[in-house]
Amino acid sequence: MNAQEANFDGLVGPTHNYAGLSFGNVASLNNEKSAANPKAAAKQGLRKMKQLADLGFAQGVLPPQERPSLRLLRELGFSGKDADVIAKAAKQAPELLAAASSASAMWTANAATVSPSADTGDGRVHFTPANLCSKLHRAIEHEATRRTLSTLFADPAHFAVHEALTGTPALGDEGAANHTRFCAEYGKPGVEFFVYGRAEYRRGPEPKRFPARQTFEASRAVAQRHGLDETATVYAQQDPDVIDAGVFHNDVISVGNRDTLFTHERAFVNKQAIYDTLTATLDARGARLNVIEVPEAAVSVNDAVTSYLFNSQLLSRADGSQVLVVPQECRENANVAAYLDELAAGNGPIRDVLVFDLRESMKNGGGPACLRLRVVLNDAERAAVTSNVWMNDTLFASLDAWIEKHYRDRLAPDDLADPTLLDESRTALDELTQILRVGSLYDFQR
């Protein structure tokens, strides 16, 4: 059946800021307490969506979550009217207010793991929201994520949206940032590839400096609940040394699409065995794996982390060629820029490189791949997505005007204490639900 990969990008929320909340994420820590520009951040992401849609790629939009999260702050013991809750948190525990105000749901690669209907046991598209239990500011996202996905992908004949896995370290799940899929064609059965940082119940290497956020047990549980064919499911461990170098998700060191794996030579433990397994498994499904392995001598792990070369989107054009979507930081790193020039000039599957300014997101450790959730849909499934979330000229104009109207152009950490920020955000989100036609999505609307 004809199918296409759609990318659903997260709209950056009005409270986008740099609070340095993500230990293990080098960019997040390096830019802690800098002033952010939410308006620029949202428009940078929106422009990427529009340009990719103009190039013929299926591009959807996911709305921000409500922030600050008054639910979290009240759960943590702050009481009173909304303004009082914010004031008390700002005075007594500003770090908790920062966690409650994070716009991190913009990185929808962590929203969920998605398996297309061609791979699942019941022939439906399956979504498992990620519990993101390693970080407080992200662990509060999964309920709203499930509500959003259930709203957009509402038809039970086509879609199954699960609850997140139990939020315990043994089942730490970071979503599609540690998952990719290989196939001959999007609509045919493929090979699902899960990458984990550690195993809770199996002895093996682990990072020493930064935490491994994804467990083998979580990856296996997602595969099982999606009803995947065990013979078409491959698990791999990310090299703990690269986690300690700042590769907190696999999509910072590797990206795959169709029959191509673009990866750094230090990405995986026992890499050759992984390549061999993927090759054999994909061969049984009618495709030959192309591994583009970037050597350390050309691009170091540090270069990869600072430029986010691998936190890129690898997209298939109608003619079968592929394009790599990278942040502009890749052009500012001499080693990475030289490698990309050589890559595009070669005879491999990647024939073109598109560069985007995503500076605001990048300063928090999120490149093009972080901002999107891949969802393979056949024609009937796409038709079942009835909300106004597909990017086109009209939606772009509406969202651009909405951002211009509602977003601040400067937000420093101290500004999170401003109670009017909550009112501004709710006003903006209320209007957004009308633009996207998603109904009463937020708690404050219910």
Curated annotation (Swiss-Prot):
Organism: Burkholderia ambifaria (strain MC40-6)
Stated family: Belongs to the succinylarginine dihydrolase family.
Pathway: Amino-acid degradation; L-arginine degradation via AST pathway; L-glutamate and succinate from L-arginine: step 2/5
Active-site residues annotated for this sequence: 174, 249, 370
Membrane found in the keyword field: no
The encoding gene: astB
Pfam families on file: AstB
Enzyme Commission code(s) on record: 3.5.3.23
Top-level taxonomic group: Bacteria
Protein known as: N-succinylarginine dihydrolase
